[in-house]
Regions:
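Short amphipathic alpha-helix adjacent to the substrate-entry channel of hydrolases
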Residues: 50-70
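Alpha/beta-hydrolase active-site loop
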Residues: 79-101
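Short N-terminal helix/helix-N-cap motif within the alpha/beta-hydrolase-1
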Residues: 48-52, 78-79
Length: 112
């Protein structure tokens, strides 16, 4: 059995639509990589929760060698459709654009 990775956790701004900073929490295994990566979009019927809601899922994934980016996105009633979808698209694009810096294998990126 492989020992779990030590991880680093940090918040980053990935977009700023209409002057509203959108944050993502990155969970990164320590090591040379590249690692597979996943963008995690929290549940909540598009109206509640945030990037830290599923922390109990993010940590084990990162400790197993997956870079996790859990994102915030605008939600009603503050921002109506399609704002949430647009923000999620920004998050995925940011993750892919920064894959090398984050030690993510660009051909092994998923979304959950």
């Amino acid at each position: 059995m492989v020992a779990p990775y030590e991880i680093d956790v940090e918040d980053v701004e990935f977009a700023c639509p209409d002057g509203v900073p959108l944050l993502a929490r990155l969970y990164r295994p320590r090591g040379p990589g590249p690692f597979p990566g996943v963008v995690e979009v929290h549940g909540g019927a598009w109206t509640m929760n945030d990037r830290i809601t599923n922390h109990d899922i993010h940590v084990p994934l990162a400790k197993s060698g997956v870079v996790v980016m859990s994102i915030d996105f605008r939600m009603p009633p503050v921002a109506m459709y399609p704002a949430s979808s647009v923000d999620i698209n920004f998050g995925v694009r940011w993750f892919k654009a920064n894959a090398e810096r984050l030690s993510v294998a660009v051909d092994k990126i998923g979304i959950v």
